[in-house]
Amino acid sequence: MGLSDGEWQLVLNVWGKVEADLAGHGQDVLIRLFKGHPETLEKFDKFKHLKTEADMKASEDLKKHGNTVLTALGAILKKKGHHDAELKPLAQSHATKHKIPIKYLEFISEAIIHVLHSRHPAEFGADAQAAMNKALELFRKDIATKYKELGFHG
């Protein structure tokens, strides 16, 4: 399931665009996630009060968390599949503290793909979308393995 060098290049090319505005992209991803899958909002005590898209757009905390999420994902993507060291603490916190099911990681992956396509259509065509989907699938597969090692079957 690994990615070719060319696929990783497509992923990292568009990620360069994301890094120019991590907080903005992250906020858009979280808004898309919460609007598309409102049940995911229940995992975030500090965001539960955000009921409308306007509330979410006005939230500096949501923007900060979006930045945190995409910073962590960027560090993982840049490892081109050799992300064990980056994945371990993330799996630990998401399995034992936050109890985030793998299904929710699928939901946020869909949100990431949607946001990247809407914000960067020229750089995120079909090939880049397929490569990013593959990279996010690899991430989910590997984090699911770590979850099982930790005894979490979410």
Swiss-Prot record:
This is Myoglobin-2. It is found in: Cytoplasm, Sarcoplasm. Belongs to the globin family. It comes from Stenella attenuata. O2 binds at H65. Its EC number is 1.7.-.-, 1.11.1.-. Heme b binds at H94. PANTHER family: MYOGLOBIN (PTHR47132:SF1). Nitrite binds at H65.
